UniProtKB/Swiss-Prot annotation:
<feature type="compositionally biased region" description="Basic and acidic residues">
    <location>
        <begin position="111"/>
        <end position="120"/>
    </location>
</feature>
<protein>
    <recommendedName>
        <fullName>Z-ring associated protein G</fullName>
    </recommendedName>
</protein>
<keyword id="KW-0131">Cell cycle</keyword>
<feature type="transmembrane region" description="Helical">
    <location>
        <begin position="7"/>
        <end position="27"/>
    </location>
</feature>
<dbReference type="GO" id="GO:0005886">
    <property type="term" value="C:plasma membrane"/>
</dbReference>
<dbReference type="Pfam" id="PF06295">
    <property type="entry name" value="ZapG-like"/>
</dbReference>
<dbReference type="GO" id="GO:0051301">
    <property type="term" value="P:cell division"/>
</dbReference>
<comment type="function">
    <text>Involved in cell division, cell envelope biogenesis and cell shape maintenance.</text>
</comment>
<feature type="region of interest" description="Disordered">
    <location>
        <begin position="107"/>
        <end position="134"/>
    </location>
</feature>
<keyword id="KW-0133">Cell shape</keyword>
<keyword id="KW-0472">Membrane</keyword>
<keyword id="KW-1133">Transmembrane helix</keyword>
<keyword id="KW-0997">Cell inner membrane</keyword>
<keyword id="KW-1003">Cell membrane</keyword>
<comment type="similarity">
    <text>Belongs to the ZapG family.</text>
</comment>
<keyword id="KW-0132">Cell division</keyword>
<keyword id="KW-0812">Transmembrane</keyword>
């Protein structure tokens, strides 16, 4: 070190300053990408949290819907049993039940014997005559 001249010390100083400058530029360029990467990771965590929350809400919704359907099915079964027992109690004999069935069959037979109409009563549209003019 004793043999080094001023020129070598100047060259070392310039190299040190240039190294600092290049290091500063490299840090400056990569610092933005590091910030961007950290920001992206934070956004990813936020989105994952929201997704997990939404999944939990959907699971809760379907579980609650299933319970409500079970309750609904049980209520309809109770209603059906109630109508069945009430029907047996109120109508009693099978002969009386047949009376209502026979009336229904007779009513449907009468309507089936009639020819279906494919026109409406009276004239309509362009060929309709105005009775006011006559």
């Amino acid at each position: 070190m004793e043999n080094w001249t001023n020129e070598i010390w100047v060259a070392i100083g310039i190299a040190f300053i240039v190294g600092l400058f290049i290091g500063y530029i490299i840090v400056r360029l990569t610092k933005g990408s590091v910030k961007h990467q950290a920001k992206t990771e934070a956004e990813l965590k936020t989105v994952k949290t929201q997704l997990d929350t939404q999944k939990a809400q959907i699971e809760k919704h379907f579980a609650e819907s299933a319970e409500l359907f079970k309750t609904l099915i049980n209520d309809y079964q109770k209603l059906y049993r109630h109508y069945a027992t009430s029907s047996n109690n109120l109508l009693g004999e099978k002969d009386q039940k047949g009376l209502f069935t026979q009336q229904l069959i007779t009513a449907t037979d009468k309507s089936q014997n009639e020819q279906p109409r494919d026109y409406s009563e009276g004239a309509s549209g362009l060929f309709k005559e105005n009775k006011e003019e006559n």
